[in-house]
């Protein structure tokens, strides 16, 4: 599929993301914890929503979680810590500093909040960053949607032969809701 993109910045960004994707090692899906993934993804998404983090942070956290679990045999009781560390790293990468959750807020999401000391959590984040060679920009579906959203719909588009100009914002909101729905499903797969 080829897109006709005229904006050179957008084209450069798209090419950069495609290049980053091509450099990723293959995801093997061999994690011993794979049977827990669905629960971990649900918990991570709910935690991200509770902290008002954007979808891009949720998706990046889940990609980090998947890829980290794919290479490590993690004790069941540590999986939620890994989720929180992935969420923290994704937020630090993806959000303004004011939106990055504080460690004290993160550990409140755990069943046993006192079980995670700040030094242990920072060490876990460091271990994860080391695993990713300190490069956690992994393009996700949400990054592509954010990048291409303005290319998808334009006020001069027609709907059943009628201009959407007067209803552009309503159509755009519906489109975003529809895309968000599919992004929520995609993260589960």
Which residue stretches match the model-derived regions?
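Acidic, Ser/Thr/Pro-rich regulatory low-complexity segments at or just upstream of the first helical elements
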Residues: 1-84, 88-167, 171-181, 185-187
């Amino acid at each position: 599929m080829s897109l006709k993109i005229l904006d050179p910045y957008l084209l450069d960004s798209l090419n950069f993301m495609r290049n980053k994707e091509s450099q990723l090692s293959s995801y093997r899906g061999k994690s011993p914890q794979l049977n827990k993934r669905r629960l971990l993804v649900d918990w991570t998404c709910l935690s991200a929503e509770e902290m008002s983090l954007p979808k891009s942070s949720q998706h990046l956290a889940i990609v980090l979680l998947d890829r980290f679990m794919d290479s490590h045999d993690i004790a069941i009781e540590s999986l939620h810590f890994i989720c929180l560390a992935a969420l923290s790293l994704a937020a630090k990468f993806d959000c303004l500093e004011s939106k990055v959750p504080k460690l004290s807020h993160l550990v409140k999401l755990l069943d046993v909040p006192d079980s995670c000391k700040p030094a242990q959590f920072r060490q876990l984040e460091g271990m994860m960053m080391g695993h990713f060679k300190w490069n956690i920009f992994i393009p996700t579906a949400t990054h592509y949607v954010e990048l291409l959203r303005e290319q998808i719909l334009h006020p001069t588009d027609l709907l059943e032969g009628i201009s959407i100009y007067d209803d552009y914002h309503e159509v755009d909101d519906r489109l975003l809701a529809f895309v968000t729905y599919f992004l929520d499903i995609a993260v589960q797969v």
